[in-house]
UniProtKB/Swiss-Prot annotation:
Lineage: superkingdom: Bacteria
CDD domains from the UniProt entry: SPO0J_N
An annotated GO BP: positive regulation of sporulation resulting in formation of a cellular spore
Protein name: Probable chromosome-partitioning protein ParB
Primary role: Involved in chromosome partition. Localize to both poles of the predivisional cell following completion of DNA replication. Binds to the DNA origin of replication.
Gene: parB
Protein keywords: Chromosome partition, DNA-binding
Family under the similarity heading: Belongs to the ParB family.
Pfam families referenced in this protein's UniProt entry, alphabetically: HTH_ParB, ParB_dimer, ParBc
Length: 286
């Protein structure tokens, strides 16, 4: 990657505007698919094969609606700046040419445009997104606020995303593979590093929800086991009262270890027995 010179600390608008040698010289044309090489400045690393095939099918039916963005790279060759999924899907669809906007821009502007184009899409995995945001912050000295405005997210969302890169590498890999969600990761970040991996592995193995991981993270911070969820069997006395009130007869619930048990309904006259059957919705006529 070319070293960025003179770009640090500049606002994003200034970066994109000043990075073009001649923005008015942009050309919309068609370019041979084989003459385009992947961009050096892409946030995306992983592309879902199934989603790519769906896009290829759409391109077969409707063509490429939105041009890719490229810049010249050698004689009759082009480097991709934005639109990698469209370019790859076009190859799968068997297209020989693709609509493209040819720009004359610097390395740093190519990086910014490529990152922002990908970050504005929602199908990056959380780690790819965090890595792209970090490059914008590190290589251009942009604040979280400036990055947030550029990609259409809140400043806190940018900060939370960047924090993912402090997780242990195995946990980052789980996020990369989408075995964990962003919500799981936020809960893990509250724990010491040693405990993050252990809880992440258990979450993946057991298929825990975000809420469950949050609960266990909070319990770990309090240095105690998670409190068991309340069940109906945990409040037998209250249930006795409710059942008695509902049926209008003396009800008794007996359990063994709050797992198995029986319900006893007491009656002392035939009329009371008939009343119980009626309350239970049983229409019995001997």
């Amino acid at each position: 990657m070319a070293k960025v010179k003179g770009g640090l600390g500049r606002g994003l608008d200034s970066l994109l505007a000043n990075g073009a040698d001649n923005s008015s010289g942009d050309r919309l044309t068609t370019v041979a698919v084989k003459d385009i090489r992947p961009g050096r400045y892409q946030a995306r690393v992983q592309i879902d094969d199934e989603a790519l095939q769906e896009l290829a099918d759409s391109i077969k039916a409707q063509g490429v609606i939105q041009p890719v963005i490229v810049r010249e790279h050698g004689l009759s060759r082009y480097e991709l700046i934005a639109g990698e999924r469209r370019w790859r899907a076009a190859q799968i669809a068997g297209l020989t040419e693709i609509p493209a906007v040819i720009k004359t821009i610097s390395d740093e502007t190519a990086l910014a445009m490529g990152l922002i184009e990908n970050l504005q899409r929602e199908n990056l995995n959380p780690i790819e997104e965090a890595q792209g945001l970090k490059r914008l912050a590190d290589e251009f000295g942009l604040t979280h606020e400036t990055i947030a405005q550029a990609v259409g997210k809140s400043r806190s969302a940018i900060s939370n995303s960047l924090r993912l890169l402090s997780l242990p590498e195995p946990v980052q890999e789980m996020l990369y593979q989408r075995r964990l969600e962003m919500g799981h990761a936020r809960a893990l970040l509250t724990l010491p590093v040693v405990e993050q991996l252990e809880l992440a592995q258990k979450a993946v193995k057991n298929g825990w929800s975000v809420r469950e991981v949050e609960r266990r993270s909070q319990a770990a911070l309090q240095n105690k086991r998670p409190e068991p969820k309340k069940t109906a069997a945990a409040d037998i006395g209250r249930l006795n009262d409710l059942l008695t009130e509902k049926l209008g007869v003396n009800a008794e619930i007996k359990t063994a270890n709050h797992k198995k048990g029986k319900i006893i309904l007491h009656f002392d006259t035939p009329e009371t027995f008939d009343h119980i059957l009626k309350q239970l919705g049983i229409d019995y006529r001997p």
